[in-house]
């Protein structure tokens, strides 16, 4: 398995605050995510601004698209995103059209695994060409005390076996990473664990050290 990447999630309410954290962390992460809350507040300009600030990083438009996959993908990739998220509840036609536009633009679609979905759904996404999904505990699940469990790991392994690479998020810390050693991990996504830390670059370094220890290979 390839070495997982480290993704900074920017779920800020203002672009100014998000860009301050990017300034602190852009040299310590591989991927910068324009989070859903940020994009709802700041619009398409958030993606454009992050692309300008981080010309050499992977930029994610975390829009959780449910319809109009082709149109929104064209806007996301046109603004400078490399990846765009589509919610798992979206019709397969939406995923297919979004994926087709991503292919034309040199980007990728990530399926956001929120709520109800099945492994048959995952096989359908893989069949039409999607190769990425995001597995996570949402904010509400974390607040209720939900922990990563065997059921989560079994589902992740099943998704990996289908051929999907997973970005994993939901209160992730460096100490959690050994749980996922048998999973096909594309990236670990951290928001508050990085941006909210007293020493963000040090925490990012701890993530990379754990990734190196488990998966091997130095960061490019």
From Swiss-Prot:
The record's catalysed reaction(s) read:
3-dehydro-L-gulonate 6-phosphate + H(+) = L-xylulose 5-phosphate + CO2
Record carries keyword Protease? no
Which GO BP terms sit in this record? 'de novo' pyrimidine nucleobase biosynthetic process; carbohydrate catabolic process; L-ascorbic acid catabolic process
- SMART domains from the entry? OMPdecase
Classification via Pfam families: OMPdecase
Q: Which cofactor does it need?
A: Mg(2+)
Kindly indicate whether the keyword Transcription regulation belongs to this entry: no
Q: How is the cofactor bound?
A: Binds 1 Mg(2+) ion per subunit.
* Molecular function as annotated in GO: 3-dehydro-L-gulonate-6-phosphate decarboxylase activity; metal ion binding; orotidine-5'-phosphate decarboxylase activity
Give the superkingdom in one word.
Bacteria
Q: Which residues form a coiled coil?
A: none
Residues given in the record as substrate binding sites: 11, 192
Looking up SUPFAM superfamilies in the UniProt record yields:
Ribulose-phoshate binding barrel (SSF51366)
EC number(s) from the headed UniProt entry: 4.1.1.85
Tell me the residue numbers annotated for binding Mg(2+): 33, 62
What does the UniProt keyword field contain?
A: Carbohydrate metabolism, Decarboxylase, Lyase, Magnesium, Metal-binding
Please explain the role this protein plays, according to its UniProt record: Catalyzes the decarboxylation of 3-keto-L-gulonate-6-P into L-xylulose-5-P. May be involved in the utilization of 2,3-diketo-L-gulonate.
Task: Please describe the quaternary structure of this protein.
Answer: Homodimer.
What is the protein named? 3-keto-L-gulonate-6-phosphate decarboxylase SgbH
**Native source species:** Escherichia coli (strain K12)
